[in-house]
Amino acid sequence: MTIAIGKFTKDENDLFDIMDDWLRRDRFVFVGWSGLLLFPCAYFAVGGWFTGTTFVTSWYTHGLASSYLEGCNFLTAAVSTPANSLAHSLLLLWGPEAQGDFTRWCQLGGLWTFVALHGAFGLIGFMLRQFELARSVQLRPYNAIAFSGPIAVFVSVFLIYPLGQSGWFFAPSFGVAAIFRFILFFQGFHNWTLNPFHMMGVAGVLGAALLCAIHGATVENTLFEDGDGANTFRAFNPTQAEETYSMVTANRFWSQIFGVAFSNKRWLHFFMLFVPVTGLWMSALGVVGLALNLRAYDFVSQEIRAAEDPEFETFYTKNILLNEGIRAWMAAQDQPHENLIFPEEVLPRGNAL
């Protein structure tokens, strides 16, 4: 028996090798295998949003004007969610709702599902792009891991939350004022600001902003003067082997300010990664809880005492009254298909009234 030892070589490349060579070639804009998902989905999501905000009304789904064509501006235009009666339908253009009629599909809110789903896969494609490039240049994949935070928030807010509710109708519409309305809705119907997962999200995002500002200022403060350039940007060679700033000086400064300081760059930068990403993950988990209508902090004893004693009121009980007002005033406007009519005597009023 003869055993041949050596590298197997093919006479000609197959289709996979040809595609792999073209997709991963070094060029000005890297394409990669991830680009097959990223570029089409991003193109369709952005294009669908521009189309919807420019031309498509929300009259048939929300009773609203939502396009530039109807007189909206950048802050008030939106791609609105489908009607509540359509529940969780994917609203495919060729589906039973639109039956291939593009105008009818737009009127029913088909552009929202189009933008939401292509947007989600576009974001996932962007994360895969970071994985692919990191692999190609032999980097760790922490950029992609960090980007999972925004993806988790997008998927939880735009997809998982409405899936837990009665339909896509209760997801945010894609517009500035529409997102603000959704935030008010979250507060009024879920008391979102008192939710511990929201608190962790705020701590993560604002904490990351603080860390970013402190880190940037500290590096600028401890730059070595190695060059004779006129300013910071000309004083260094981008290929220099030496450190650009003094970690020792920075450590001494913050040790004197706070009594503690980061002892090495790895721990410092990991902490700057950990704080915002964990905050985003936690807020995404909280939104998943809201999709299931889970409640967080309910201080019932304070509510009972406030109801019995007109002189007792806390910031919590005031906020509960505010939430009741949001629900009573917002539901009738936000869900016109329900024909909700609240008589004056049931609308909430503060104890002072």
UniProtKB/Swiss-Prot annotation:
InterPro entries in the cross-refs: D1/D2 (IPR055266), Photo_II_D1/D2_sf (IPR036854), Photo_RC_L/M (IPR000484), Photo_RC_L/M_CS (IPR055265), PSII_PsbD/D2 (IPR005868)
Residues that hold chlorophyll a PD2 according to the record: H198
Transmembrane annotation, as ranges: 41-61, 125-141, 153-166, 208-228, 279-295
Recorded topology in the membrane: Multi-pass membrane protein
UniProt KW keywords: Acetylation, Chlorophyll, Chloroplast, Chromophore, Electron transport, Iron, Magnesium, Membrane, Metal-binding, Oxidoreductase, Phosphoprotein, Photosynthesis, Photosystem II, Plastid, Thylakoid, Transmembrane, Transmembrane helix, Transport
Residue positions where N-acetylthreonine is found in the record: T2
Catalytic reactions of this protein: 2 a plastoquinone + 4 hnu + 2 H2O = 2 a plastoquinol + O2
A GO molecular-function annotation: chlorophyll binding
GO CC annotation: chloroplast thylakoid membrane; photosystem II
Modified residues (Phosphothreonine): T2
Binding locations of a plastoquinone: H215, F262
Cofactor binding annotation: The D1/D2 heterodimer binds P680, chlorophylls that are the primary electron donor of PSII, and subsequent electron acceptors. It shares a non-heme iron and each subunit binds pheophytin, quinone, additional chlorophylls, carotenoids and lipids. There is also a Cl(-1) ion associated with D1 and D2, which is required for oxygen evolution. The PSII complex binds additional chlorophylls, carotenoids and specific lipids.
Localization annotation: Plastid, Chloroplast thylakoid membrane
Function: Photosystem II (PSII) is a light-driven water:plastoquinone oxidoreductase that uses light energy to abstract electrons from H(2)O, generating O(2) and a proton gradient subsequently used for ATP formation. It consists of a core antenna complex that captures photons, and an electron transfer chain that converts photonic excitation into a charge separation. The D1/D2 (PsbA/PsbD) reaction center heterodimer binds P680, the primary electron donor of PSII as well as several subsequent electron acceptors. D2 is needed for assembly of a stable PSII complex.
Additional notes on this entry: 2 of the reaction center chlorophylls (ChlD1 and ChlD2) are entirely coordinated by water.
UniProt protein name: Photosystem II D2 protein
Organism listed in the record: Solanum lycopersicum (Tomato)
Species classification: Eukaryota, Viridiplantae, Streptophyta, Embryophyta, Tracheophyta
Gene name of the record: psbD
